[in-house]
A protein has these predicted regions:
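Residue(s) in the substrate-gating loop at a strand-loop-helix junction
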Residues: 189
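Active-site helix of classical SDR
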Residues: 169, 205, 213
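Substrate-binding pocket helix/loop in short-chain dehydrogenase/reductase
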Residues: 145-146, 153-158, 247, 251
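Alpha-helical segment proximal to the catalytic Tyr-Lys
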Residues: 174, 218-222
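Conserved glycine-rich cofactor-binding loop
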Residues: 60-61
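Short, small/polar-rich loop/turn modules that mediate ligand/substrate recognition or access, typified
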Residues: 221, 226, 280-282
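C-terminal substrate-recognition "lid" of short-chain dehydrogenase/reductases
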Residues: 166, 259-287
Length: 292
């Protein structure tokens, strides 16, 4: 054969498609096909039934309870905590387990206590294997002049509102980094953006949460973890029911939307953040009806 014909033959051989032997009519081939189909269908069913997990602090009432209801309705297993109103939290958990076919863990403790946070996160991971969404919602307020505060009041507000966010993030992040996936949503306030007279400590904590959110979003973005915050305006919760009807009416008049926000609206936005594009990161989303 000439050199040209050898080259032509070689070219044809190199482009011939590779074909697997046909084992479909053999016993081993049938077993292999059946095994593959079983594996594929089992994996498909496992993916269909696999639920995500959300850990929500301050979940017994108000925004926290609305968050729990929304994520439960979307099929999330839940880990919920509160400091007071534990019976209310348990009743909520029972209701959600029954109506949404999910599992709920309830914890009672002070989110300002680092040991409590460590135990809660570990038990949640032991039970569910992962925490897909962390929502830092727990918070307390102090209304009064700064000069009337003592150091105990200040430390308690900072521990509950700000240090707790560090604590939960510190404990949850390693598992999210390992999974290369996760959402951290911090419930903040417009007072963190502009400050409020007679709520200095609360404003300082919320401002700290906003800065933490922006910085941590940058830090965790390479690990495909999104960190965002919701800066709430006036939401109709127990925290704002200290106002008289006259004060509430005057406050509502200042809000372009003409009403207070609802806890369910906060929960809806939080769920949107938990399912948003990974490119949305380190942002503070204001939910205030156009108020600030």
């Amino acid at each position: 054969a000439t050199s040209a014909s050898r080259t032509q033959r070689s070219t044809k051989l190199s482009h011939a498609p590779f074909q697997l032997p046909n084992y479909s009519n053999t016993f081993s081939g049938v077993c292999l096909v059946n095994f593959f189909n079983l594996w594929y269908n089992t994996k498909k069913e496992w993916r269909r039934t696999m639920k995500h997990t959300a850990l929500i602090t301050g979940a017994s009432r108000g925004i926290g309870a609305a968050l729990a209801c929304r994520f439960a309705a979307e099929g999330y297993h839940l880990a919920l905590c509160c400091h007071n109103s534990y019976e209310t939290l348990q009743a909520l958990a029972t209701k959600l387990e029954t109506t949404c076919s999910i599992q709920v863990l309830c914890f009672r403790g002070d989110v300002g206590d680092y040991t409590f946070i460590c135990d809660m996160v570990q038990k949640t991971l032991d039970t569910f294997g992962q925490i897909d969404v962390l929502i830092n919602n727990a918070g307390i307020s102090y209304i009064g002049l700064l000069t009337d505060m003592d150091i105990t009041d200040w430390n308690q507000i900072v521990a509950t509102n700000l240090t707790s966010v560090f604590s939960t993030c510190r404990q949850v992040i390693p598992s999210m980094v390992h999974a290369k996936s996760g959402h951290i949503i911090n419930i903040s306030s417009v007072w963190g953006n502009v400050g409020a007279s007679c709520e200095v400590a609360y404003s300082a904590c919320k401002g700290g949460i906003n800065s933490l959110t922006r910085a941590l979003g940058k830090e965790l973005a390479p690990s495909n973890i999104q960190v965002n915050a919701i800066a709430c305006g006036v939401i109709d919760t127990d925290m704002n029911r200290c106002f008289s009807e006259e004060e509430r009416s005057a406050l509502i008049e200042e809000i372009p939307a003409g009403r207070m926000g609802s806890p369910e609206e906060v929960a809806s936005l939080a769920y949107s953040l938990a399912t948003a594009s990974s490119y949305l990161n380190g942002q503070i989303l204001t939910l205030d009806g156009g108020w600030i």
